[in-house]
Every structure is written in structure tokens, then in C-alpha cells.
């Protein structure tokens, strides 16, 4: 064959089926490549200003979680002690006292330019304005019954009125101030008084034996005379009234009312004459009124010497200390010291001495 024949000879041709299968393979490869590129996207390229741009062209924002700081548990403060609450407090209101009144806290009179004070709406307790803090925890014992009258002859110790609230509701006519004083004195000295009840004063025992031995001697000169025997019997208790511990030139009178709580207590009203049998104990004396014998506190009586007279105050009076006058309340017991001068007389209350008008005194 010549060169022309070789050049002009036809090229070998592939069948159509093989061509189509090759195209299908290319398409499949391209499809796989497109899915792979979607899965593996390149990270966003940073811009000149430092912001990252996503595939869509918008900026990408990053969210950072804040770290929670662990707070230290603070120690709880100690619990506060429970505050006392008064379930029945006083209901004080401003009050103008036309007549002089005593403060139930400090026992001073509300007079002169200080007539303005406080009065409880229910129990009618009178106090100064500056004394209100002392009765914040004091319970009010309610409205006073219509038949209740305060015994102003009793000593004024009103800083302790808690023990007498129940007694006042049960016995409407008892003085709360006096009940507090009486209960405190009796409970404080109860043990001493028990031992004292069994022991008798030897001098008093001798005085009791003397009348028994003197009875037959007194009956001899009056044989057959029954009146003489009665007189002798009447003289016998009079001999027992002699005070072995004191001189016979004086006697004792009750300043305040003392109400007996026990069987061996001596009950007496103010102004009663008392015969002292035993005064060996400083806190409890043994006395006699008529046929009654018992114990009582010595600060409830006053000694009256020969020539002195006992009076009862018929009207309250506010005295001027600058001129030696004394302030007394109604129904108070006093002892006269000296004679009258200018309508005034010198009196003694057991604690204070001063001048008092005779028009307001009644001799007992």
C-alpha cells in the first residue's frame, strides 16, 4: 500500500452503546462531586474590618455563654430573741388633772404647771408623761367596777401591780397597790415566820403565867362576892396587854389595813390600836387585838407616845415644802406632834414630818 492509501484509510469507530455509558458515568461523577462540595464548605473569609461573612454574604454572629460565678454562701445571722408582747396594754390619753393626783409609777403628785398627764381609758391609772416607758409591759386589769373605791390609806408601791390582777377581778374592793405589797412581804418572809410561830417570847410566857397564879389570891378577900370575881377576870386580860418588849408609856396604832392570808396572821384596819407581844423579829412582829393574836409587818404600825394624839385625814391636802407643810391623802393616819399654832399642827406619818391644817384632821 502506498502512503496515500494509508492516510485515506478510515478511522475505527466505537459503538454507540459504549459512548452513552461513558456519559452516564461522567454525570454520576459530577453529581457526587456537587454533593461533596455542599457538605464540605469552606470557612467564611474574614473581611478587612475583621467581620466574618457567610456563604449568603451576611455577617456571622457568635454567641458566647457567660460563665456563672459561684457565689459563696453567706452565714445566716443568729436568730433574734423573741420580743415580749403585752396582750393587754394600757390605753393612755392626755388628761388635765383639775385636782392633785399621785402618779402610780413614781408616787409623785401631778400638780402646779405640770397638771397635764396621762390617764388609762380602762383602769383610770394616772401617770406622768415621762413615766410611760415604765408601764409598757404592765397589763391593764380592765375597767374598774362601779362599787370600787381605791383605799388611799395604803402605801403607794405601784411599780409591781402584776401579782394582783387576778385578785382584783375576784375581789372588786381590794386595793391593787396594797395587795402587791402585802403579797410580797408575806412570801419573802414566809419561812422565817413559820419558825417564829412555835417560839414564844419568854417574857410574854411569864406574863401569861402571872395572872393564873394571881387569880386565887385576888379571890380571897372577896369571898362570896361574884362581882369581885368578874372584876378579877376582867383585869387578867388587861395584864396580858402589857408590852413586854417596850415601855408602857406608849402604844401602837395601825397606819394601813393588813389583810391576813394565813391563820396565824393578824388582820386589822387602819387606826386600830395594837398591843405588841413579841418584837424579836425585825420583819414580823407578834401582836394582839382583843382576843385575836397573830403576826403582822412592823411597817404597818406607828408608835404613839404619851401626850400624843392620833388623827385621821378627812380631806387631801397639797402642802408647800418651802414653808414646812406636808402633803397627805384622805383617810391617812397621822400622829400629832406638839400643839396647834395658826391653824396648823405638826404631824408625823412614820416617814415624814410637817405642818398640816387642823380643819382637815379628825381625832380617833
Curated annotation (Swiss-Prot):
SUPFAM superfamilies according to UniProt: Cysteine-rich domain, SH3-domain
One family name in Pfam for this protein: STAC2_u1
Matching InterPro entries: C1-like_sf (IPR046349), PE/DAG-bd (IPR002219), SH3-like_dom_sf (IPR036028), SH3_domain (IPR001452), STAC1/2/3 (IPR039688), Stac3_SH3_1 (IPR035736)
Keyword Cell membrane listed: yes
Location of this chain's protein in the cell: Cytoplasm; Cell membrane, Sarcolemma; Cell membrane, Sarcolemma, T-tubule
Alphabetical UniProt keywords: Cell membrane, Cytoplasm, Disease variant, Membrane, Metal-binding, Repeat, SH3 domain, Zinc, Zinc-finger
Region (Disordered): 1-89, 189-244
Biased composition (Acidic residues): 64-78
Renumbered zinc finger spans (Phorbol-ester/DAG-type): 89-140
SMART domains documented for this protein: C1, SH3
Biased composition regions of type Basic and acidic residues, renumbered to the chain: 212-242
Gene3D superfamilies in UniProt: 3.30.60.20, SH3 Domains (2.30.30.40)
GO cellular component: cytoplasmic side of plasma membrane; cytosol; nucleoplasm; synapse; T-tubule; voltage-gated calcium channel complex
Subunit structure: Interacts (via SH3 domains) with the calcium channels CACNA1S and CACNA1C. Component of a calcium channel complex with CACNA1S and CACNB1. Component of a calcium channel complex with CACNA1C and CACNB1.
Functional note: Required for normal excitation-contraction coupling in skeletal muscle and for normal muscle contraction in response to membrane depolarization. Required for normal Ca(2+) release from the sarcplasmic reticulum, which ultimately leads to muscle contraction. Probably functions via its effects on muscle calcium channels. Increases CACNA1S channel activity, in addition to its role in enhancing the expression of CACNA1S at the cell membrane. Has a redundant role in promoting the expression of the calcium channel CACNA1S at the cell membrane.
Record PANTHER family: SH3 AND CYSTEINE-RICH DOMAIN-CONTAINING PROTEIN 3 (PTHR15135:SF2), STAC (PTHR15135)
Name used for this protein in its record: SH3 and cysteine-rich domain-containing protein 3
Organism: Homo sapiens (Human)
Amino acid at each position: 500500500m502506498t502512503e496515500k492509501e494509508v492516510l485515506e484509510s478510515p478511522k475505527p469507530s466505537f459503538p454507540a452503546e459504549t459512548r452513552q455509558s461513558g456519559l452516564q458515568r461522567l454525570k454520576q461523577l459530577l453529581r457526587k462531586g456537587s454533593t461533596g462540595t455542599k457538605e464540605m464548605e469552606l470557612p467564611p473569609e474574614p473581611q478587612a474590618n475583621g467581620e466574618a461573612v457567610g456563604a449568603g454574604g451576611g455577617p456571622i454572629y457568635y454567641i458566647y455563654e457567660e460563665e456563672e460565678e459561684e457565689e459563696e454562701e453567706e452565714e445566716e445571722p443568729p436568730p433574734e430573741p423573741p420580743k415580749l408582747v403585752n396582750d393587754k396594754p394600757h390605753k393612755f390619753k392626755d388628761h388635765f388633772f383639775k385636782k392633785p393626783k399621785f402618779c402610780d409609777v413614781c408616787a409623785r403628785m401631778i400638780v402646779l404647771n405640770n397638771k397635764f398627764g396621762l390617764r388609762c381609758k380602762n383602769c383610770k391609772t394616772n401617770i406622768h408623761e415621762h413615766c410611760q416607758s415604765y408601764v409598757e409591759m404592765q397589763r391593764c386589769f380592765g375597767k374598774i367596777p362601779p362599787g370600787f373605791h381605791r383605799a388611799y390609806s395604803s402605801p403607794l408601791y405601784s411599780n409591781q401591780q402584776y401579782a394582783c390582777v387576778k385578785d382584783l377581778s375576784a375581789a372588786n374592793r381590794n386595793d391593787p397597790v396594797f395587795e402587791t405589797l402585802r403579797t410580797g412581804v408575806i412570801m419573802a418572809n414566809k419561812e422565817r415566820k413559820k419558825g417564829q410561830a412555835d417560839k414564844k417570847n419568854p417574857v410574854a410566857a411569864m406574863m401569861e403565867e402571872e395572872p393564873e397564879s394571881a387569880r386565887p389570891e385576888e379571890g380571897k378577900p372577896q369571898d362570896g362576892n361574884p362581882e369581885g370575881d368578874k372584876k378579877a377576870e376582867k383585869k387578867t386580860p388587861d395584864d396580858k396587854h402589857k408590852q413586854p418588849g417596850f415601855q408602857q408609856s406608849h402604844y401602837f396604832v395601825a397606819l394601813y389595813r393588813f389583810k391576813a392570808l394565813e391563820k396565824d396572821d393578824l388582820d386589822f384596819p387602819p387606826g386600830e390600836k395594837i398591843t405588841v407581844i413579841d418584837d424579836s423579829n425585825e420583819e414580823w412582829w407578834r401582836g394582839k387585838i382583843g382576843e385575836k393574836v397573830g403576826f403582822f409587818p412592823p411597817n404597818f404600825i406607828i408608835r404613839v407616845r404619851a401626850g400624843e394624839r392620833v388623827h385621821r385625814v378627812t380631806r387631801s391636802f397639797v402642802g408647800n415644802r418651802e414653808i414646812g407643810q406636808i402633803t397627805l391623802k384622805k383617810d391617812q393616819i397621822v400622829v400629832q406632834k406638839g400643839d396647834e399654832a395658826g391653824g396648823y399642827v405638826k404631824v408625823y406619818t412614820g416617814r415624814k414630818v410637817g405642818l398640816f391644817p387642823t380643819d382637815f384632821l379628825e381625832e380617833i
